[in-house]
Amino acid sequence: MVARHRAQAAADLASLAAAARLPSGLAAACARATLVARAMRVEHAQCRVVDLDVVVTVEVAVAFAGVATATARAGPAKVPTTPG
């Protein structure tokens, strides 16, 4: 359970850091996501940008149990459209 929470925290922080860096370009944004995730002791981090959203997926090793995976998205709020 602790590994899952650590993975989610790393994904959340990495995606927010990447979104803040997105104006500098895709490479800079994903480099920042990887840097933040590694600082939080994540074994694997994947970053992708979809429109203006940064999506980060991380994996944290769990002793004797495999891997805990978490994904987070950071970007502009999605405003529901209403017919009108």
From Swiss-Prot:
Signal sequence segment: 1-39
Compartments (UniProt record): Secreted; Host cytoplasm
One GO CC term, this protein: cytosol
Domain of life: Bacteria
UniProt keyword terms in alphabetical order: Host cytoplasm, Secreted, Signal, Virulence
Keyword Signal: yes
One GO BP: symbiont-mediated suppression of host apoptosis
InterPro entries in alphabetical order: Rv3654c-like
Coiled coil residues, start to end: none
Induction of synthesis: Component of the Rv3654c-Rv3660c operon that is highly up-regulated during M.tuberculosis infection of macrophages.
Predominant subcellular localization, coarse grouping: secreted
Subunit organization: Interacts with human polypyrimidine tract binding protein-associated splicing factor (PSF).
Function noted in UniProt: Effector protein that participates in the suppression of macrophage apoptosis by blocking the extrinsic pathway. Recognizes the host polypyrimidine tract binding protein-associated splicing factor (PSF), which probably leads to its cleavage, diminishing the level of caspase-8 in macrophages.
Protein name: Apoptosis inhibitor Rv3654c
Organism of provenance: Mycobacterium tuberculosis (strain ATCC 25618 / H37Rv)
